[in-house]
Amino acid sequence: MATSVDNRHYPRLSSALNGGVVHSFKPPLVPSPSLDRDQDQSVNVPTEKSVDKTTKEDRFDSSDDEDESHNRYVSYYKEMVLKSNSDLEPTALDSRDESTGDKWIHRNSSMVRLTGKHPFNAEAPLPRLMHHGFITPVPLHYVRNHGGVPKAEWSDWSVEVTGLVKRPAGLTMEQLISEFPSREFPVTLVCAGNRRKEQNMVKQTIGFNWGSAGVSTSLWRGVALSDVLRRCGVYSKRGGALNVCFEGAEDLPGGGGSKYGTSIKKEMAMDPARDIILAYMQNGELLTPDHGFPVRVIIPGFIGGRMVKWLKRIIVTPQESDNYYHYKDNRVLPSYVDAELPNEESWWYRPEYIINELNINSVITTPGHEEILPINAFTTQKPYTLKGYAYSGGGKKVTRVEVTLDGGETWSVCELDHQEKPNKYGKFWCWCFWSLDVEVLDLLSAKEVAVRAWDESLNTQPEKLIWNLMGMMNNCWFRIKTNVCKPHRGEIGIVFEHPTRPGNQSGGWMAKERQIEKSSESHPTLKKSVSTPFMNTASKMYSMSEVRKHNSAESAWIIVHGHIYDCTRFLKDHPGGSDSILINAGTDCTEEFEAIHSDKAKKLLEDYRIGELITTGYDSSPNVSVHGGSSVMSLLAPIRQLAPTKNIALVNPREKVPVKLIEKTSISHDVRRFRFALPSEDQQLGLPVGKHIFLCATINDKLCLRAYTPTSTVDAVGYIDLVIKVYFKNVHPRFPNGGLMSQHPDSLPIGAVLDIKGPLGHIEYQGRGKFMVSGKPKFANKLAMLAGGTGITPIYQVIQSILSDPEDETEMFVVYANRTEDDILVREELEGWASKFPDRLKIWYVVEIAKEGWEYSTGFITEAVLREHVPEGLEGESLALACGPPPMIQFALQPNLEKMGYDIKEDLLIF
């Protein structure tokens, strides 16, 4: 989404000069989008100076008649901008951005966030987008950010032009606007992922859930890329100049750390018919931070992913860009290619799958999702008007839009509204709107309404969805379903359902159909008795407010992909402890569940499914509004919490807490200690000993969560420390891509923000030998502490707590297994404690591969190792604490501890 410095007036919307094709730019002082709104500072944009006198043939030469005509159209577009902004509310700082790098950006609160808090990826609600018409207000323009928004200053920004050019240059913003002719015209931008959620409802792609509003239109002003390249003396094709690469300013994690970059063919860059510009104004204002202030690339008719924001470098090269995002994004791979195959067989690097130009697409926007059309004497006297948008790529004009009410048997041609004038080469860069009047009684008898568009090349939309790994370029017929309902007073009506709702919002007919399909697979006999997909009574339907009531250990329900699961009987068996379920009880936890669970876990979940979520928007539950009195209390989390006497960060285990990376220390070649600042300097984390947290990040556009135990003390103020073993790619042959989450913080710059969530876990050490395990007290004065690899961190946490209390006399016996001696984590701290407290802590190591002179055990943890180094199992005297790989727990610890007298169910506590 775009940011607006304020809901401003437009004193700079002056008539275009010299035909609207070649302008001199005369803006007055304007606020810098990079500055805090409370600061009274401004950027002095130069007034008209001598525009570079390029030769006539270098210019966009046009006749006087064309110039005059274009002049009128630019004025017309500017009137549209004013009209579009007439009922736009001011933007504001958003509380969701407070602890991210984007906290300084003003945004429109109505934007639907698609990837959580950060990075900011958003689209406007579809009705709101269409309400503003042909020109989209900047704050409602869709936003695709791969990371944090760079802070930029107009006065010191420059764009480097280098590579195969005779005169490399660093062009300042002043030079761009004063030394080159400017151009101004409307362009529709579309994300290649527009309508992706429809694909995700069929089969999950690797992309997040764009709805059908990943499209927006603005009036852009900038300088021609071809003019800039000519000024710098771009080489000919024979001289090797085949590609023009663009690089932005943001720091991103992809490929181990990079900028966002991509490229286009040089002949495209130099083609005057393509109108490619380096834009610095949008809808009559300087660009806003979310849209690339101070300068970005605009390539009309292309996908948004080629239009690099915060442009810093233009490089002319023989080869296309080698940037990570050029290859690992914006591709349409064959439908059979899954998430593993592209890396194994180099599919990413095959040129035939790259996306450049947009394809033909259309969407129904009226009726809206869950809109109800009453059927009565008044409404049946006049037709109902269906409406929507359509666009195509490459400058092709949309020539026809058709609607069917009978599944494609017959089609009605719609009325088209093209509100743009083509450029002098006949190219159309913007969406058009369509409408069709239909009889209400025809809608009543229809089961669905579908639309398809055609362009001047007679390209049209396929009937069925074509799934691809990245979920790109979805342009199948857009279908809405109709159902008869009874809105009030005994009337009947038609309720319309769109296929999906953007982001993680529930609803849409595709969710219902998927539920029916899964139910039919589980109960084959249903297929014979179910006449329509909306009559399936096999699954009970529940409202969201009903689900919210089941948010305690007595009754724990969750929602995943629109299905409702009763996890109450699984609380005691959950490997991550009951808290991992309870913090999500009564909520839709689709994103969190997908981020941390395997396919096996997803299949296991089906045993607990009890019904489906009602997605029509009606709620028959008691009033839960402010006026509902005590009913509001039903929404409160059931997890018992003591009122905090200190300022703690983890107040609510259901909420994410942003933390900033402030220090990174290399302990070994693959082990890092990361220090994160808590939101407030006087805060403690508030994590009970024995519990852990989730570290949350959006990686490659998907939420990723991993459990970690801090190594900082529980009373540390203002920060937490995490010791993480980094599993690098191309090290282990079984895992060529390495660890997704472990590599992520290592690739981040200081100052980057991640989220944490917790406390989680079923074990809590309460001090002096006392534990609380899944709500049951346990006691021991001797602890067998058994760890493998990174599993030492929860053990470390308990040791740290015990040794910090002089009156805690609990004896600890640690056996710590690793592959090699170099893999031993926090060894210095462990041995320091063992030396200082020899009567309270004893350490023994086991390594699979030992160096010469190794003083400890070699191989694996065996019964002999345990008998020699940990106490026997005695009821009320000893407990075993363990954390490590499942094979170690299952084959090395459980059978051998049982031989030593431990009750595996009661005396072995597994973190």
Swiss-Prot record:
One of its GO terms (biological process) is nitrate assimilation. Its EC number is 1.7.1.1. Residues 1-68 are annotated as: Disordered. GO terms for molecular function: FAD binding; heme binding; molybdenum ion binding; molybdopterin cofactor binding; nitrate reductase (NADH) activity; nitrate reductase (NADPH) activity. Mo-molybdopterin binds at residue 191. It catalyses: nitrite + NAD(+) + H2O = nitrate + NADH + H(+). Coiled coil: none annotated. Its cofactor is FAD; heme; Mo-molybdopterin. Residues 654-766 form the FAD-binding FR-type domain. Keywords: Disulfide bond, FAD, Flavoprotein, Heme, Iron, Metal-binding, Molybdenum, NAD, Nitrate assimilation, Oxidoreductase. CDD domains: cyt_b5_reduct_like, eukary_NR_Moco. Binds 1 FAD. Binds 1 heme group. The heme group is called cytochrome b-557. Residues 49-62 have a biased composition (Basic and acidic residues). InterPro entries: Cbr1-like_FAD-bd_dom, Cyt_B5-like_heme/steroid-bd, Cyt_B5-like_heme/steroid_sf, Cyt_B5_heme-BS, FAD-bd_FR_type, Flavoprot_Pyr_Nucl_cyt_Rdtase, FNR_nucleotide-bd, Ig_E-set. Belongs to the nitrate reductase family. Homodimer. Nitrate reductase is a key enzyme involved in the first step of nitrate assimilation in plants, fungi and bacteria. This is Nitrate reductase [NADH], clone PBNBR1405. The gene is NIA1.
